[in-house]
């Protein structure tokens, strides 16, 4: 049984805990602690009731020291609640934590990861790209087999790299990619304002529900980290739209082979049924963003939107639940880190 602690119980942290149970991975993963500065009552309430993902199927109760996840048998899992702002003070050694899932979005350097290890954790997985000095960045389904025992401080990438990198991999292996551009059409996030208010990014001073808002993105750097051969070959822009969840990615690539739409789509279908099963999905149903809410795949390609211009310019629309899909990949990567360890976790 892999013992994990969740540091930061916001959107991703809560989804990770919920995914442990909804995916059935509670047979493999035991959450022993959650570190969050918020009060236990609010933590329990937001875990039980979620605007985007609905009511959690497990009953949640709490006291001042524990979140309790109840099973139909009457038994429950007691998860220790911590309220510590300094990593060095976290009792990971006493709790015998194997992997810390750091979902704060604040910490992300090698030094931050090593601080968790000094506190007693064996390994650390960050829920965002983090610094360039980390031991590895994993996009599950693409490069998780590169994990080694000595990789102690690891990044799970971002929701958008988890969405687009598997598709880039499939297209490149099948047709050869020369270059590409991406537009991320991303749901609003909690770093935006409900009504106009101050922010150091002037576009993010504006009300999230009233505008399509361009924001900075380093997605191209995330692609280069996984595929160094694509250095300076991809560019990306991102806009936030007035929805609370689910993201669409508009991918355009120039390839080396002359293809038709069906060639591209069939390549994705084949991958979704084989090498990227449970990571990539494919649909031709006339769906909209809400239909992909709570979808555990990293990427869902809408084949009706695939276009080919002049044989070698390919455009695709790729969906993802930027919260739920990513949370499920955090668990997959954590288990892959366990599998790569020489010392049993």
Swiss-Prot record:
Entry-linked CDD domains: GAPDH_C_E4PDH (cd23937), GAPDH_N_E4PDH (cd17892)
InterPro entries: E4P_DH_bac, GlycerAld/Erythrose_P_DH, GlycerAld_3-P_DH_cat, GlycerAld_3-P_DH_NAD(P)-bd, NAD(P)-bd_dom_sf
Catalytic residues in the record: 159
Alphabetized GO MF terms: erythrose-4-phosphate dehydrogenase activity; NAD binding
Pathway(s) served: Cofactor biosynthesis; pyridoxine 5'-phosphate biosynthesis; pyridoxine 5'-phosphate from D-erythrose 4-phosphate: step 1/5
Keywords per UniProt: Cytoplasm, NAD, Oxidoreductase, Pyridoxine biosynthesis
Reaction(s) the record says it catalyses: D-erythrose 4-phosphate + NAD(+) + H2O = 4-phospho-D-erythronate + NADH + 2 H(+)
GO biological process: pyridoxal phosphate biosynthetic process; pyridoxine biosynthetic process
Family: Belongs to the glyceraldehyde-3-phosphate dehydrogenase family. Epd subfamily.
The name this protein goes by in its record: D-erythrose-4-phosphate dehydrogenase
Species name: Vibrio parahaemolyticus serotype O3:K6 (strain RIMD 2210633)
């Amino acid at each position: 049984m892999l013992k994990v602690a969740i540091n930061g119980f916001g959107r991703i942290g809560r989804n990770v805990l919920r995914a442990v149970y909804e995916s059935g991975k509670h047979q493999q993963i035991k959450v022993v602690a959650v570190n969050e500065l918020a009060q236990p009552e609010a933590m329990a309430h937001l875990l039980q009731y979620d605007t985007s993902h609905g009511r959690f199927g497990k009953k949640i109760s709490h006291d001042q020291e524990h979140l309790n996840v109840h099973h139909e048998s009457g038994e429950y899992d007691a998860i220790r609640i911590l309220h510590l702002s300094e990593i060095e003070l976290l009792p990971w050694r006493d709790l015998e934590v194997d992997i810390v899932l750091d979902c704060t979005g604040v910490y992300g350097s090698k030094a931050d990861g090593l601080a968790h290890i000094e506190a007693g954790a064996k390994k650390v997985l960050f829920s965002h790209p983090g610094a360039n000095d980390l031991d590895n960045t994993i996009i599950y389904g693409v490069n998780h087999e590169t994990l080694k025992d000595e990789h102690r401080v690891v990044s799970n990438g971002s929701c958008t790299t988890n969405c687009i990198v598997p598709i880039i991999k499939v297209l490149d292996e099948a047709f050869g990619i020369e270059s590409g551009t991406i537009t991320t059409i991303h749901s609003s996030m909690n770093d935006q304002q409900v009504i106009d208010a101050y922010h150091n990014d002037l576009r993010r001073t504006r009300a999230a529900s009233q505008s399509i808002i361009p924001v900075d993105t380093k997605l191209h750097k995330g692609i280069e980290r996984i595929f160094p051969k694509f250095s300076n070959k991809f560019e990306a822009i991102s806009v936030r739209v007035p929805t609370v969840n689910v993201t669409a990615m508009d991918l355009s690539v120039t390839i080396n082979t002359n293809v038709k739409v069906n060639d591209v789509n069939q390549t994705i279908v084949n991958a979704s049924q084989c090498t990227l099963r449970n990571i990539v999905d494919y649909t031709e149903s006339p769906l909209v963003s809400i239909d992909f809410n709570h979808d555990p795949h990293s990427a869902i390609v809408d084949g009706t939107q695939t276009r080919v211009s002049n044989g070698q310019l390919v455009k695709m629309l790729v969906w993802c639940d930027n919260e739920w899909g990513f949370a499920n990949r955090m668990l997959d990567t954590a288990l892959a880190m366990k599998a790569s360890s020489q010392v049993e976790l």
